[in-house]
C-alpha cells in the first residue's frame, strides 16, 4: 500500500509525467530487446499504440483508385504520404469499414468449401446439447487425442503432395499421388475449388486441416473422440464438468471406432483357425471399412488398441513399444530385469511354469477406467498407487498389478485348478491363467495379501481388502490417489515380430501383445464393415453362413462344376466350406459327408443323373471328413434359427428352395441369386463341364485311335482331334479348340451336340 501511495504522489507531479512521456529510451540493452528479430515482443501494447495512430494500416497503391479519399461522414480514409521503406500507402481503419460496406462483392460459393471444417464445427455445436454442470474432483489424465474433427488420415507427406497439386498445380516439383485416398481427394478438391478467389495460402492451410490428423497430449477426464476434444474447454475444468452430447459425428472418429471393432472380430476369428497368422492377413486384406480397404486404413491410422496393433504387426508395420497385460497398457519408466523360467506351486498344489522378471522396475499402467504407478522387485510388489473412476475399476487395476508382481502370496491364493482355455480350446499361458482366475473372484487374493497402517499423505488414502477406502489401514503397498497417471506420451514406434499364433514381440523377445489381450467387448460399428473372407461369414450368425456358402457356390459355379467332376477332393477341402460345418450337428457330419460323396460318385458314373441344383444343395455337406457307412438320408439337418431345420435331398424346403420358372434360389426365404445353367439341360452337365474347350464334331471316327477317357483329354494339343468315351459307353469325336474365347458356349452346345452325335 505504501508503494502505491508513493507512486500516486509521484504521478500527480507534472514533472514526473513529462519525464516518463518525453524522455528518449537510450539504454542499449532495452533498445536491443525491443528491436532485435522480427518477433513482436509486446503484441498487445504494439496493437494499442498502432491503433491510436491515424493511419495504422498499409495497403497496395492500387487502393487509391478503388476507395474515395473521404467517406460519407467526411472522414479521411487514406493519407497521401507513402509508408516509409515501401511503396505502399497509409490507410485508416475506416477504409476497411468502407471496403466491407461498399467494396466489390465476390462469390461466396467457395467459402463453405474451403472453410469446411469450421462450418461443420458450427453445425455440430448448434445441434449439440449441453447438460448440467456438476462440481466434483476431476481425475484427468493426459492422453494423446485427436484435436481436429473431420479429417482424412493422410500422412504429412501425402497431404503436402495433394495440397501442392490442388492449390499450386503449375508449381515445379515432383509429386507422386499413389494411394487411392490421395487420388480421390485431389480429384474432388480440384472440382470444388475451380475459379476459387480465396488466397491460395489460406486454401492450403484449410486443406491441411482436412487431410491430416493432428494430435495433442492433453489432460482428459471423459470422451476422447475428436468431437469431444473440440469442446474440451467447455466440458471439463479443474473441479467441474459439463455434460455434452455432440451434434454430429465425424468420419475420422467413426473410422477409429469401426477399425477397432473390425480388428477385434478378425483377431478373435483368426485365433480359432488352423493357421492364425495367415488367416488374419487374408481377412485384413479382404475387408473394407466404410468402402476403404482395411490395410490402407491400418497403414495410416495411429489408433493404438490391442487388436489393431496385432493386425499392424502382422502387416509388418511398427507399433508402440509399450506392452499389454490384463487390458492395461504397461510402460516401463525405469529399472530393468532379466527373465528366468521358474516352477511355482499354487494353493491347490498345481505346478505352474512362469517367466519371472528378476530385478527392480517401475511401470505406468493405463487402462480405460483406471491408471496406476507400479514399483516392483523380483516377485514382490513394492508400491502401487492407483486412481480410477470407481471402486470396480480400481479393483481391476489392483488385481492386474498383483498378478503381474508374481508374488508368492498371490500364487498361493489360487483355489481349485487352473484350466482356462482360449477360443481355440488351447490352454492359456500361466500368467493369463492366474489373471482369469482372480478376475473371476479376488476375495482370497485380497484377504491373503496383508494390510499395513498408513501415514497421512496429501491426496492419498488406503484401500481395504473389501475395496472400501480407509485413512488408517491399507492393502500392503497399495494406495489410492486422487490424481490420475498420464498415458505414455511418446509417439515412437518400434519394429516388432509376430509368430503364427499372433504373439507380438519386440526385438529383445519380450511379448508385447497376444490374442488373450484382445477385449471381448462387443460394439456396433459406425461405418459398414464388409468382410469378404469366408472366415467372417459366421460373424452375423448361422443364417449368414448358410446364405454366404450357397452364394459362393453359385458365384463360382463354372469352376466348381469342373472341380466337382475332375478333382472333387480339392473342392471338398476348400476353406469356404469350413464355416458351414458348424451348422451341421456334430454326430451327423461324417455320415452326411459319406452319404453325399457316394451320391456324387454315382452321378459321375451314370450319365443323365447330373443335377445342378442338387449338387449345389448338397456340396457343403461333403466337406466334412466322411464316414464309410451304408446310411441313406432323405433329408439333412442344419442348425439355424435356434433349432434344426431340414434340407430335403430331393425337392425344395424352406431352407433351400429353387424356383424352376425364375431360376432363382431362395435360402431361408431370402433371395440368394440366379443359376445361369438350366438344371434340365444339365443332365449331361458333367460332359459339358469337362468338354469346355472342345468342339464336338460328331460320331466316333476310328482314324483317331481308341477312345480316351474324359481325364485323358487334357493332354491334347490345340486343334488336335480324338475320340472320347462319355457317360454310358458312348463315344464321340472331339477337337481341342484353337481359341479360348469360345469356351463359354461349349457347355451349352456340348449337351445338344452329344445327343445329336449319339443319336
UniProtKB/Swiss-Prot annotation:
Motif interval(s): Nuclear localization signal: 736-739
A Pfam family the protein falls into: Flu_PB2_3rd
UniProtKB keywords: Cap snatching, Eukaryotic host gene expression shutoff by virus, Eukaryotic host transcription shutoff by virus, Host gene expression shutoff by virus, Host nucleus, Host-virus interaction, Inhibition of host RNA polymerase II by virus, mRNA capping, mRNA processing, Viral transcription, Virion
Residues with site note (Avian adaptation): 627
GO biological process terms, semicolon-separated: 7-methylguanosine mRNA capping; cap snatching; DNA-templated transcription; symbiont-mediated suppression of host gene expression; symbiont-mediated suppression of host mRNA transcription via inhibition of RNA polymerase II activity; viral RNA genome replication
HAMAP family: INV_PB2 (MF_04062)
Protein name according to UniProt: Polymerase basic protein 2
Native organism: Influenza A virus (strain A/Hong Kong/212/2003 H5N1 genotype Z+)
